[in-house]
Amino acid sequence: MPNWLLPENIADVLPSEARKIEELRRLIIDNFHLYGYELVMPPMLEYLESLLAGAGHDMDLRTFKLIDQLSGRTLGVRADMTTQVARIDAHLLNRASITRLCYCGSVLQTRPNGLHATREPLQIGAEVYGHGGLEADAEIQELALASLALAGFTQVRIDLCHVGVLRAIIASDVQAQKDENALYTFLRAKDVPALQEMTLTYGADTRRALLALPGLYGDVTVIARAREILPKLPGIDTALDELIALAGLAGETSVTIDLADLGGYQYESGVMFAIYVPGLPNAVARGGRYDHVGEAFGRARPATGFSMDLRELARLLPDAEPKLAIRAPWGREPALRTKIGALRKAGEIVIQSLSGHENDQDEFECDRVLVLEDGNWIIKNLG
């Protein structure tokens, strides 16, 4: 096997793509700061039990594991940063007030999330801790849409769901409670035949409601249909009320309701959303409420947030034009060094030519040149 081959769904990021990613990261992180979010940087790996606390079986399957040579304990390489940030809020910051945190870093996953997806996403996201009301969910939804707008994605669709619907349906059926994980899997895949077979021994109302969920998809009128079809349970009524409220706060953004889109069900506790852009089957951003994750770290706090993959977003953007730069000769003369330093301080890209490589600049377009005239270094236009 050639030494330059990488594992499947793992890839290097080359200069033009890296520039798009970094510029986008700066835009989004700076915008988070304008909303009052503080940046945190969790470690790449942790003890496995801490990393998976409250995260569910699906996250366990997606996590790479290794043995710590110092302690002999099992470590996990983070596959998602959400629980790490929840640990920071619950255990390290330990604030009583509302806390807004943001983050950006690479995660590593045993399997890709979708066709042609990377197993090393560059995850960026934001979380609000300490407020259980819809105001926090609305802020996170607004921030996610604003982040995508900064990347140039304004024609997006937000897909809303609520885990409270499924949990209310199965709460009164003992057999359904035993099959909760399988039901989640079948509903997420909209596998109606499997649902029909699994629910044969359930109560009639439970079975009817579960089989209806995959078809409860469409615009906001789906909520009215759900009120007619689903059992009259307080948990369902509350969930549908929250969905209609958040749908009304989306402004001009296209909104769909999908009561079977249960990504993250195992640790989410309320509203969930996924945001899609035209021409791409997978969501570019996902978020929702997860009030119980902090319990694993000894401090339950209301929490809601979202995340997205910067590498995926950058891949969707058009190739950037080469940066304009100034070409300068190589030299250590004090006057030349002073002039180059002043230009760089002013924000100009100045590239010093090495002997025999004066025109070798793939990533930059040198439209000006620094020349010595009458004892002064001046800039002249090229072409």
From Swiss-Prot:
Pathway: Amino-acid biosynthesis; L-histidine biosynthesis; L-histidine from 5-phospho-alpha-D-ribose 1-diphosphate: step 1/9
Signal sequence extent: none
A GO molecular-function descriptor: histidine-tRNA ligase activity
S-S bonds: none
Chief localisation class: cytoplasm
Pfam families linked: tRNA-synt_His (PF13393)
Keywords tagged on the record: Amino-acid biosynthesis, Cytoplasm, Histidine biosynthesis
GO-annotated cellular components: cytoplasm
GO BP terms, alphabetized: histidyl-tRNA aminoacylation; L-histidine biosynthetic process
Further comment found in the protein's record: This function is generally fulfilled by the C-terminal part of HisG, which is missing in some bacteria such as this one.
Subunit structure: Heteromultimer composed of HisG and HisZ subunits.
Matching NCBIfam families: PRK12292.1-1, PRK12421.1
Function statement: Required for the first step of histidine biosynthesis. May allow the feedback regulation of ATP phosphoribosyltransferase activity by histidine.
Family classification: Belongs to the class-II aminoacyl-tRNA synthetase family. HisZ subfamily.
Protein name, as recorded: ATP phosphoribosyltransferase regulatory subunit
GN (gene name): hisZ
